[in-house]
Amino acid sequence: MTLSHDISGSGPTLVLVHGIVHRRQAWDSLLDQLTPYRRVVTVDLPGHGESLLPELGPDVMGQLIDDVSEFVKEVTPAGERAHVAGNSLGGWIALSLAARGDVASATALSPAGFFVNHLDQVRAINTFRALRGTAKLMGDGLPRALRYKLIRYPALAAFFAHPSHVGYAAALADCRSLVSNELVDLGLEMDFALPPIVDPTVPVTVAWGRRDLILPVYQAQRVKKPFPQAKLMVLPGLGHVPMTDAPELISSILLAGSEPFGSRAKSVSAAG
């Protein structure tokens, strides 16, 4: 299917996948650091931003992963395997593509799917529902209310450790997306299951904000079981959407995670 997207920069292709209720603009703060070194593709997931929500079957997660896999192939030049990075739901999608061996590498920022049990998943989805309920209560007064920092900053605090980094226009767009998104209500039905056999040859990087209030950092301990090859790091002082909290740091993590394999091997050899 065709998904709304933007392409900029040059170098190895790096596809960036946002989280649930977000938009491809979630990555805007990184583009200046990434595009001199990567051909960056930012995409709106189905039912997000400018991408339409297709008719969904019983396996919503599998359908999303297949749609993104098809999209990645469409936007990647012939003869190249793309690198993929994602945040939250986008992080899980990136890891799923790595598990299937569909991509050159995967970098996941506070990825979904590592809930310690079903109650943990319920807690995460109910957090989104509570935030959406608050935004809906504001109704037509939402644009005016968000102009006040005393309202805007607390409204964003679940997602960002530093909500002051989010401008008014972006905050309004994000809140409207939260209100209108239809996938949140399917969150409890989503099956976060990896293939029985995970490709261990695909490089994986997982970075988790220590101040993540949506998907707490304790979930990170579950990453190594399915991805023993993963480079796992905890990021002090960063929240669920770390791209906005610390653009330069996250850019460096994405560049390192998507380093071509040959260069990666040389770096390791030199370090040794």
For the regions a language model picked out, list residue spans one by one.
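Short glycine-enriched nucleophile-adjacent loop
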Residues: G91-G101, A106
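Conserved catalytic-core motifs of eukaryotic protein kinase domains, centered on the activation segment
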Residues: A26-D28, S51-G57, N117-D120, V217-Y218
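Conserved alpha/beta-hydrolase catalytic His-Asp/Glu region
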Residues: G141-V198
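Conserved serine/cysteine hydrolase catalytic core
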Residues: S180-K225, V234
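Active-site loop/oxyanion-hole signature of alpha/beta-hydrolase fold enzymes
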Residues: T2, S8, V41-L89, S252
